[in-house]
Regions:
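DNA polymerase processivity clamps
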Residues: 1, 7, 13-117, 126-176, ...
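Short, structured "edge-of-domain" segments at secondary-structure transitions
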Residues: 177-181
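Short acidic (Asp/Glu) and glycine-rich catalytic loops that position anionic groups and cofactors
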Residues: 183-188
Length: 305
């Protein structure tokens, strides 16, 4: 058994746990490692495919990539994702929105390192290799207006430029010549979900807005409720919620979580929490599975807990 476990790369400490620990702990250790290894393998495959597709041909250039999408859907997706772009570009590429063109979907990503928004759209037609392009955030407004005015659009990206094309007009998109952080890595490294909360989006947003001046707001899940309180205060507000999994506590800067709620769609929002209070929390629109935000919580010792 030792040779088999070493053959799959299981760390020595985990091998000892499997061999010497109780069966329940051994199973949990192996399942956790399998999830991590699967994520790493997926990331490696996607990264190598992206790099291979981006390699130049014998003439030193790569073919343009085009995808055809619905204009109103593209406008909606850009409106949702772009608020996560950095307002102060200490890392210039974060002042942009990543458009990842693929064979089956167009994925849009923006982040300021404290929260990330990701939305995918199905494509009707595609040609050329998978290709990323980073569009300047201050050009997104014009792109939204252009997309909303056309039923179908072709997004064309070459080595030199990016263009939105309708049947009779086109819009050039200013791009940033920099590598966007790997959102695949972020998604692959998310910890296992230990609890899930479905809560009224408007009520949660209202309470967060009321507490917007606080350094941190603590959220605690219960059997059928979500409690909110200012960190350091024993009193708070209880909201009705549908909760599954463990009872969990985490804390956020109100403005960060509020930003994720503002761009969500539908009457309810879904929070997916890990057992580790300082790990990222996934925020989803309960009725829109193609849009995801990831919000970094506050370390409560840093917030004065």
């Amino acid at each position: 058994m030792i040779s088999r476990l070493r053959g799959i790369g299981l760390p020595l400490q985990d091998i000892r746990t499997v061999l010497d620990g109780p069966p329940e702990q051994a199973r949990a250790t192996l399942r956790t490692y399998a999830e991590q290894a699967t994520g790493i393998a997926r990331q490696a495959r996607e990264t190598t495919e992206d790099v291979i597709a981006s390699l130049p041909d014998s003439a030193g250039t790569t073919a343009p990539t085009t995808v055809v999408v619905r204009g109103p859907e593209l406008a909606s997706a850009l409106r949702q994702v772009s608020p996560a772009a950095a307002a102060v570009p200490d890392i210039p590429v974060l002042k942009g929105v990543l458009l990842q063109l693929g064979a089956d979907e167009l994925t849009m990503v923006a982040t300021d390192r404290y929260w990330m928004a990701v939305r995918s759209l199905p494509v009707e037609e595609t040609s050329g290799p998978d290709r990323p392009v980073v569009v300047a955030a201050d050009a997104v407004g014009a792109a939204v207006r252009f997309a909303a005015a056309h039923d179908r659009l072709r997004l064309r990206v070459s080595d030199d430029d990016a263009t939105l094309e309708s049947a009779d007009e086109e819009l050039g998109l200013p791009t940033l010549d920099a590598q966007f952080p790997s959102y695949h890595s972020v998604l692959a490294s998310l910890p296992p979900m230990a609890g899930r909360v479905t809560v009224d989006r408007t009520r949660l947003a209202t309470e967060l807005l009321r507490l917007d001046d606080a350094d941190a707001v603590v959220l605690t899940t219960g059997a059928d409720h979500l409690d909110l309180r200012v960190d350091g205060d024993r009193h708070g507000v209880r909201l009705g919620a549908i909760c599954t999994g463990e009872s969990l506590t985490t804390a956020f800067r109100p403005s960060l979580l509020l930003g994720a709620l503002d761009v969500s769609i539908g009457p309810e929002v879904l929070l997916e929490l890990s057992a580790e209070a300082n790990r990222p929390v996934v925020v989803r629109s309960a009725d829109q599975g193609t849009f995801t935000t990831i919000v970094m919580p506050v370390r409560r010792d840093d917030a004065g807990a």
